[in-house]
């Protein structure tokens, strides 16, 4: 499964630090999610989807929209 967090963040020119601060997370945690070293729980996935205004299916690489 493709996780589009890094793609979305880079497209919008947002640093890991800014994303972490905006979502009240640690930058290291964002890095681990992006590198698939850690899996985000459902609540965190919703935060990412809401932040980037995309569906969970898109965020998880299940759809192209």
Regions found by a protein language model. Give the residues of each.
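A short, Lys/Arg-rich alpha-helix, primarily the initiator
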Residues: 1-11
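Alpha-helical residues within the helix-turn-helix
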Residues: 10, 21, 50
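Short, charged recognition helix plus adjacent turn
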Residues: 11-12, 60-65
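Short alpha-helical DNA-recognition segment
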Residues: 14-32
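DNA major-groove recognition helix of helix-turn-helix/homeodomain DNA-binding modules
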Residues: 43-58
């Amino acid at each position: 499964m493709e996780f589009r967090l890094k793609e979305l963040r880079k497209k919008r020119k947002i640093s890991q630090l800014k994303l972490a601060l905006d979502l009240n997370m640690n930058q290291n945690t964002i890095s681990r999610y992006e590198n698939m070293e850690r899996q985000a729980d459902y609540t965190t996935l919703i935060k990412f989807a809401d932040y980037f205004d995309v569906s969970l299916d898109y965020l998880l690489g299940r759809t192209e929209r």
